[in-house]
């Protein structure tokens, strides 16, 4: 996977956390920049670790399904992207954007884990594509840190407008990446 595909994947994966951080930023009366950085770091570190875990799980199984690697990656991205799109169209009952005044470390870690489960599944798919997982995980973590920090700072202004649309956009990006992987592996790319 080249750098532009890695960046697209990373920012696509960060949309879940971005949507959650907009909600968090909207809940806090006046989020400080250091709160946004702290939240971004927590989300970024967790989002970087989970694809490594998924990759390790997928790597051990890769010898059994190498012939189907592109189908596995495509299916995972399609399911995850589709789920993000569906959740983006759901009503405001989404627990990740819940208006909770508590900005504790435990709450942030729980939210970060909840939004990073997709990254673990992506890690499984990446094991079949034989990518540099450390590089990819670092890019995913950095992209998530940037997007969460931005989401926190602008959340109180655009939370009601963009919160769910960000998740839909992220889901569509993942579906597009899955289609591109399938397209390339079926021999249509030059």
Swiss-Prot record:
It comes from the Bacteria. Signal peptide: none annotated. It is found in: Cell inner membrane. It is a multi-pass membrane protein. InterPro entries: Mntp/YtaF, Put_MntP. The chain crosses the membrane at residues 3-23, 41-61, 62-82, 105-127, 143-163, 168-188. Disulfide bonds: none annotated. One of its GO terms (molecular function) is manganese ion transmembrane transporter activity. Pfam families: Mntp (PF02659). GO terms for cellular component: plasma membrane. Keywords: Cell inner membrane, Cell membrane, Ion transport, Manganese, Membrane, Transmembrane, Transmembrane helix, Transport. Belongs to the MntP (TC 9.B.29) family. Probably functions as a manganese efflux pump. This is Putative manganese efflux pump MntP. The gene is mntP.
């Amino acid at each position: 996977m080249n750098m532009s595909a890695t960046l697209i994947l990373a920012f696509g994966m960060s949309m879940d956390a971005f949507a959650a951080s907009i909600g968090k930023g909207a809940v806090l009366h006046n989020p400080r920049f250091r709160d946004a950085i702290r939240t971004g770091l927590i989300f970024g570190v967790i989002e970087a670790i989970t694809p490594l875990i998924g990759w390790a799980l997928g790597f051990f199984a890769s010898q059994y399904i190498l012939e189907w690697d592109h189908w596995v990656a495509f299916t995972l991205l399609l399911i995850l992207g589709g789920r993000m799109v569906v959740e983006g169209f759901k009503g405001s009952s989404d627990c990740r954007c819940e208006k909770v005044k508590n900005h504790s470390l435990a709450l942030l870690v729980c939210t970060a884990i909840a939004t990073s489960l997709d990254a673990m599944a992506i890690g499984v798919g990446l094991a079949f594509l034989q990518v540099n997982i450390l590089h990819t995980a670092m890019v995913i973590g950095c992209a998530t840190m940037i997007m969460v920090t931005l989401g926190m700072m602008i959340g109180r202004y655009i939370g009601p407008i963009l919160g769910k649309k960000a998740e839909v956009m992220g889901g569509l990006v993942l579906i597009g990446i899955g289609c591109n992987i399938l397209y390339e592996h079926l021999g249509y790319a030059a």
